[in-house]
Amino acid sequence: MATKKLNDKDIMNLLIDTAIANGATSADCILSRSRGVSITRRLGKDENIQRYEDFDTGLRVFVNNNIASVSTNENSEKSLKEVAKRAVEMAKIAPEDEYSLIASKELLQQFPIQEDIFIDSYDSIEPSVNIIRDRASEVEDIALSVKGITNSDGADASWGEGETLLMT
């Protein structure tokens, strides 16, 4: 039988729900994804080309005033449940921290979230590898065009994007 692929919300809910079911008094979860491309050119030739795709989830668990934090890049239901259970066990033996808490609804109302604000702060179009290579070449060519410069340690160009989600 095929395993159901969990989406980001499912992953975060599973971690928090499992922590609560195993004795946590509260929990919050952060999930981040990023991807990108980087190219290094040296003396007109490709020296390094990298592509990355990262995924990481963090879980902070409270057992009264005892806190534990864990992170994982696993995304199977079985692994996530185990991570959440371990976090609760860690929190149970952690020293108390009376100053750490998840903000209550009352506290959050003092500083309401303005959900209608959206900041599109990046270009969402991924450039091709050739465009990134051309940008690195252009930078190196400019440096080498300076009178007296005869060698280069190379030039880098890269593109990346990421997103971070928080659930309480």
Locate predicted features:
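Active-site bordering "gate/hinge" segments
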Residues: 1-168
